[in-house]
Design a protein with these regions (language model features):
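Auxiliary Fe-S-binding modules of radical SAM enzymes
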Residues: 1-22, 181, 185-189, 199-336
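Conserved N-terminal glycine/acidic-rich loop preference
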Residues: 2-19, 35-36, 70-74, 112-117, ...
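Canonical Radical SAM [4Fe-4S] cluster-binding loop centered on the CxxxCxxC motif
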Residues: 14-55
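Short, small-residue-rich loop/turn micro-motifs
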Residues: 28-30, 38-41, 130-132, 198, ...
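Glycine-centered loop/turn positions within well-structured domains
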Residues: 32, 135-136, 261, 287
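Residues that scaffold the ATP/ADP-binding catalytic core of kinase and kinase-like folds
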Residues: 33, 37, 83, 136, ...
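A short acidic, helix-capping loop that chelates divalent metal ions and anchors anionic groups
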Residues: 42-47, 134-141, 203-207, 288-290
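Radical SAM/AdoMet-radical enzyme domain recognition
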Residues: 51, 57-74, 79, 83-197
C-alpha cells in the first residue's frame, strides 16, 4: 500500500493560491425554476448513469483531503437535498480521516424534515437561498409556491444546530431590490446571517443584464439608511465582506463578485455532479475525473489530474473584460 505523507502537499496554482475549499455538486436537478437561473420547463438533466455514485463522491473527497489538503467541502447542486440517501453520504464523508468540514447550499425545500439527520450525520453549516419574503413574489421568481417550506427549513436548521445558518439573496433591480433591508432585518430577528450576492452571468438563458445587477455598494448604501453597520471585514479567504448591525450580534455580508472581484485570494475548486473538475466558477474547460475513476485509475493518477487542472487556473474570471466568455454550463449544472 502506498504510504501517504503526514501532511499533504498543498494544492497550489501558478499564482501561489492555495486551494483548500471544494464545492461538490451532487445533482444538477432542482425542484425550483428560478427565473434568473433556468427556463420554466427546466433543463435537460444529466442521465443518472453519468452522475457520480456515492462511492465515487467519497473517493474523490478522500483523495482531496488525504493528498491535496482539502479541508472544507460544500455540497451543492442543482438542489443537493434531492440526492437520495444524502444523510448516509454525509456520514461517510464525515468519517474520513482527515475529515473535512461539511456544509451545504440549498433552496431549503425539504430541509425541515432532513436537518436533524444531516446534523447527526456530520453536517456543520447550511446556506439557504431566499430572495424574497413575500409569498406572491417568491412564486413569481421561483415559479413554485413553496416559501412556507423554505421558512420552515430555516427554522429547522437553526434548531438542529446547523450554525451559522446563512441566507443567500441575489438582489435584482426591479425584482426584489426593495427587500434588501427587510431581508437583513428578518435575518437579524431570527438569528440567521445574511448574504447579498451580486448577480453573475451564469443563467441558462444567457439573459444576464449588468444594468439590473444591484451592486454591493448599493446594497450597503440601502442597509446604511436603516442600520448602523460596524465593519467586520473578510474572514480568511471567504468571499463575503461582513458588517455587524450595531447593538446586535447580527452579521450581514456582501459578495461583490463582479464589482470587486476577489479572484486573487480564491481558494476554491469545483466538481460537477458528473465528475468534471473546474478550477474556476467561470472556467471554460474541465478535467474529466469520472472517466479516470471508471477506467480504474489509481489515487495518484487522479491526484495528478487534479493538480494539473488547478495548475492551469487563470488569474481571474474576466467578467469585466471584453474578452469574457460565459461557461457553457449554467450555475445549476456547476454548483455554487
Amino acid at each position: 500500500m502506498e504510504r501517504l505523507p503526514e501532511v499533504p502537499s498543498p494544492l497550489v496554482d501558478r499564482f501561489g493560491r492555495v486551494h483548500t475549499d471544494l464545492r461538490f455538486s451532487l445533482t444538477d436537478r432542482c425542484n425550483l425554476r428560478c427565473t434568473y437561473c433556468m427556463p420554466a420547463e427546466g433543463l435537460n438533466w444529466l442521465p443518472r448513469a453519468e452522475v457520480l455514485t456515492d462511492d465515487e463522491v467519497v473517493r474523490l473527497v478522500r483523495i482531496g483531503t488525504e493528498r491535496l489538503g482539502i479541508t472544507e467541502v460544500r455540497l451543492t447542486g442543482g438542489e443537493p437535498l434531492l440526492r437520495r440517501g444524502l444523510p448516509g453520504l454525509v456520514a461517510r464523508l464525515s468519517a474520513l480521516d482527515p475529515a473535512p468540514e461539511l456544509s451545504i447550499t440549498t433552496n431549503g425545500i425539504g430541509l425541515a424534515r432532513s436537518a436533524v439527520a444531516l446534523r447527526e450525520a456530520g453536517l456543520s453549516r447550511v446556506n439557504v437561498s431566499l430572495d424574497t419574503l413575500r409569498p406572491e413574489r417568491f412564486a413569481e421568481i421561483t415559479r413554485r409556491d413553496r416559501i412556507k417550506d423554505v421558512l420552515a427549513g430555516l427554522s429547522a436548521a437553526r434548531d438542529a444546530g446547523l450554525n451559522p445558518v446563512k441566507i443567500n439573496a441575489v438582489p435584482v433591480r426591479g425584482v426584489n431590490d426593495d427587500e434588501i433591508v427587510d431581508l437583513a432585518a428578518f435575518s437579524a430577528e431570527h438569528g440567521y446571517q445574511m448574504r447579498f450576492i451580486e448577480s453573475m452571468p451564469l443563467d441558462a438563458q444567457g439573459a444576464w443584464d449588468r444594468d439590473r445587477m444591484v451592486t454591493a455598494a448599493e446594497v450597503l448604501d440601502r442597509l446604511g439608511e436603516r442600520f448602523e453597520l460596524v465593519p467586520v471585514g473578510r474572514q480568511d479567504n471567504a468571499p463575503a465582506e461582513e458588517w455587524r448591525i450595531a447593538g446586535t450580534d447580527a452579521l450581514v455580508g456582501v459578495i461583490a463578485s463582479v464589482t470587486r472581484p476577489f479572484c486573487g485570494t480564491c481558494d476554491r475548486v469545483r466538481l460537477t455532479a458528473d465528475g468534471q473538475l473546474r478550477n474556476c466558477l467561470f472556467a471554460t474547460e474541465e478535467s474529466d475525473l469520472r472517466s479516470l475513476l471508471r477506467r480504474g485509475a489509481d489515487d495518484a493518477t487522479v491526484e495528478g489530474a487534479w493538480r494539473t487542472s488547478v495548475g492551469g487556473k487563470g488569474p481571474g474570471h474576466a467578467i469585466n473584460s471584453p474578452e469574457f466568455r460565459r461557461p457553457e454550463r449554467p450555475m445549476s449544472a456547476i454548483g455554487g
